[in-house]
């Protein structure tokens, strides 16, 4: 299973991303971390991400050999495709890093980078709710029980695709695939940090959000967005 990367499985960790950084700084190979439970998970902007036992907490770490653009979007597309193949669920994508199923967030992507010595390292963190308690209704899940064989297949498939991203070999037509699976294509959205309302119409060459307002195109590089009707 572990050709081309070192794999570590844990019962419980604080953060799979933190563990991944500790491992990758002393490794020549790529590193994958999987935990059955994560007690101090986080999302973008240090938001807390609950990762109780029975879900997927995963991190993929590598040494940067080149500048990688739109990494969060590409990783999200990989996760979406792997969930479709392994679990037969049609998950949608929300810019820039959320996974949506039945109008609720069921997971997300967190990209973090650190420099050790002169070498930049990047970790792609992935959190996915397989099945959560019904009282946590503000989150969604894909309503699948934890079966380690399926999780193992998912990890292998996802890791091989993330290796392609890390090595600069990702599908050149990925933006069309991403847009075809976007949950808010041609929908009105709100930019969280400015409260500006735009119509989402596409992506820039580096993964920027392209919005339309009063006939003028706007490019958003960094923010979260709100979409009416989603969680």
Q: Can you say where each PLM-predicted feature lies in the sequence?
A:
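N-terminal lobe of the biotin/lipoate ligase/transferase fold
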Residues: 1-86, 115
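Long, positively charged amphipathic alpha-helical accessory segments at protein N-termini or as interdomain linkers
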Residues: 2-3, 65-67, 73-91, 101-231
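Active-site proximal loop and beta-alpha junction motif in alpha/beta enzyme cores
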Residues: 7-9, 95, 129-131
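A short coil-to-beta-strand element that immediately follows conserved catalytic motifs
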Residues: 31, 90-94
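Short loop/edge segments at beta-strand edges and connector loops
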Residues: 11, 93-95, 172
């Amino acid at each position: 299973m572990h050709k081309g990367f070192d794999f570590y499985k844990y019962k419980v960790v604080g953060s799979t991303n933190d563990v991944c950084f500790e491992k990758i700084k002393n490794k020549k190979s790529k590193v994958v971390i999987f935990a059955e439970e994560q007690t101090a998970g986080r999302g973008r902007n240090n938001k807390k991400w609950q990762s109780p036992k029975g879900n997927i907490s995963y991190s993929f770490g590598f040494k940067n050999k080149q500048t990688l653009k739109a990494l969060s979007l590409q990783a999200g597309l990989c996760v979406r495709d792997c969930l479709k193949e392994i679990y037969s669920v049609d998950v949608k994508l929300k810019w820039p890093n959320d996974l949506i199923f039945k109008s609720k967030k069921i997971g997300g992507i967190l990209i973090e980078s650190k420099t050790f010595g002169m070498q930049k390292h990047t970790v792609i963190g992935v959190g996915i709710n397989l099945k959560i308690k019904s009282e946590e209704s503000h989150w969604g899940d894909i309503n699948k029980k934890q079966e380690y064989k399926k999780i193992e297949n998912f990890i292998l498939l996802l890791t091989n695709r993330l290796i392609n991203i890390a090595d600069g070999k990702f599908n050149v037509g990925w933006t069309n695939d991403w847009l075809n699976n976007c949950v808010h294509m041609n929908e009105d959205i709100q930019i969280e940090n400015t409260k500006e309302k735009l119509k989402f119409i596409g992506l820039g060459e580096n993964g920027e959000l392209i919005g339309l307002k009063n006939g003028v195109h706007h490019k958003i590089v960094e923010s979260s967005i709100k979409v009416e009707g989603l969680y």
